[in-house]
C-alpha cells in the first residue's frame, strides 16, 4: 500500500506543470517556448511572387488578421 501511494505521489509530481508554458512550432523548423503574454500559436500561409508557399509559425498574443491563417491555444498545435 505504501509503495502504491509513493508511486502515485511521484507520478503526480512528474506530471504536474508548475508553471503554464505554451510550446509552438516555429520557422524554419523546431519549437519554441512562448513568453508569458503569448497565449496562442499561429500559422500564416503567404504566397510569394514566384508562387511559392511560405509558412510562418510561432507564438502570438493575438491572432493575425487576414485570410490563410490559423490560431490555436494548445501546445504544438500549429503544425
Curated annotation (Swiss-Prot):
Reply yes or no: does the keyword Nucleotidyltransferase apply: no
Q: Which InterPro entries does the protein's record reference?
A: Snake_3FTx, Snake_toxin-like_sf
Q: Which UniProt keywords apply?
A: Disulfide bond, Secreted, Signal, Toxin
Q: Which GO terms describe its cellular component?
A: extracellular region
The signal peptide annotation in the UniProt record is 1-21
CDD domains in alphabetical order: TFP_snake_toxin
Q: In which tissues is it expressed?
A: Expressed by the venom gland.
Disulphide bridges = 24-41, 34-59, 63-71, 72-77
Which molecular function GO terms apply here?
Answer: toxin activity
Compartments, record wording? Secreted
Q: Which family does it belong to?
A: Belongs to the three-finger toxin family. Short-chain subfamily.
Protein name (database record): Scutelatoxin
Organism of provenance:
Oxyuranus scutellatus scutellatus
